[in-house]
Amino acid sequence: AIKAFYPARVPFPLLHIDTGHNFPEALVYRDWLVNHYNLRMHVGSVQKAIDEGKIKEEKGFNASRNNLQTYVLLDELEKGKYDAALGGGRRDEEKARAKERFFSHRDEFGQWDPKNQRPELWNLFNGRKHFGEHFRVFPISNWTELDVWRYLAAEEFPLPNLYFAHKRNVFERDGVLLPDCEYITRRPDEIVKEELIRCRTIGDMTCTGVWRSSAATIEEIIQEVATSRLTERGGRSDDKRSETSMEDRKKQGYF
């Protein structure tokens, strides 16, 4: 969008659904991006919705605010009367996203019906909607993780250091390395160790699994991704709650 509208300002705002459980580095990068490119940003707060009694926080060892984002997201989209929301989802990430259209229609409740999707022939997209409905538009649906990194290398676009190898205190839970943080309650047998890791996908600290890696440059990451046999969301604990976890959330209005 920045390149498409340059030298003019991007005419639409960014929307961040803030769970309050973010990596601090992600928020620093978000604020830098907004200021550097003179962008507008709206922030929907999950914590505010909890405080107002609109949603209830999960409890227990695997508690996460991931699902709670849906209510806040739909509320913000309704307030803004948006016709469409642009996202970076890709089909190679997860099986539910693999069958989603470029123009993903959402009904008046913000819900997605995977059995009622519109045909998309070549580059022809149907943008018709009724009042109260909207679209989630995913321009890079057919890109792979490797495509993304090759593009970033070509554009030399600045990125948060979370994507590059760094030392962090982590512990293992159900085969996933999780960052040690104040938002996660550890079990007695979960031991914290400092490891050299990086993030392949970034969400809440409570559900973002990290990967052991020494890739400290984009070129090294490209080599690593090219030989990887696991998808980037393979470390996301929120996708492991059930076989259809992502699809169930998307039906409710998730990203």
Give short role names for the model-derived ranges.
Residues 1-255:
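Nucleotide-activated chemistry modules centered on ATP-dependent adenylation/adenylyltransferase
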